[in-house]
């Protein structure tokens, strides 16, 4: 199906482009959301008449998104989640979680605007892209930790997972030393009894 785009759409085109898309994509997404018109003579004329208004509306939306992006720039959202000793989360952090954290911090971010390549499954700092408009994108930091104290340590640059592993290794070494000492002591005692 041929459609006329009313706004810039990634991997499809810019305002006014006439592109071919699958029927379902046009009928179920582009047309109902007001992102495109069916490409026929009537709609081509209508688009040309309304082109300036459409471009002005898109420019206003882009400017509003740019203002929000300037506010979001450098923002760090802290998410407290349960995790194992290795730093592996029991669940995962999704786009919805990031959007809710942004809302709680007073920013207006839609879940669909958050771009995660894959869910976050470990504690630590992650960079997440937020696309507020087709032409406006911003990177934010997501700090996933088991407690607010860990989150503060991570913000200062400490690698919590490495610290946990070092702590676990030190504890294992200490226990191994205690076991070796106990075995040596038991060996000495055994020699006295015989």
Curated annotation (Swiss-Prot):
GO cellular-component term (any): ribonucleoprotein complex
Residue ranges of the region described as Disordered: 166-194
Disulphide-bridged cysteine pairs: none
Pfam families found in the cross-reference section: Ribosomal_L9_C, Ribosomal_L9_N
Keyword Ribonucleoprotein among record annotations: yes
Keyword check for rRNA-binding: yes
Biased composition regions of type Basic and acidic residues, renumbered to the chain: 185-194
Biased composition (Low complexity): 166-184
One example GO MF annotation: rRNA binding
Keywords assigned by UniProt, alphabetized: Ribonucleoprotein, Ribosomal protein, RNA-binding, rRNA-binding
Gene Ontology annotations of biological process type: translation
Family to which the UniProt record says this protein belongs: Belongs to the bacterial ribosomal protein bL9 family.
HAMAP family documented for this protein: Ribosomal_bL9
Purpose: Binds to the 23S rRNA.
The protein, known as: Large ribosomal subunit protein bL9
Species assigned in the record: Hyphomonas neptunium (strain ATCC 15444)
Lineage: Bacteria, Pseudomonadati, Pseudomonadota, Alphaproteobacteria, Hyphomonadales
Recorded name of the encoding gene: rplI
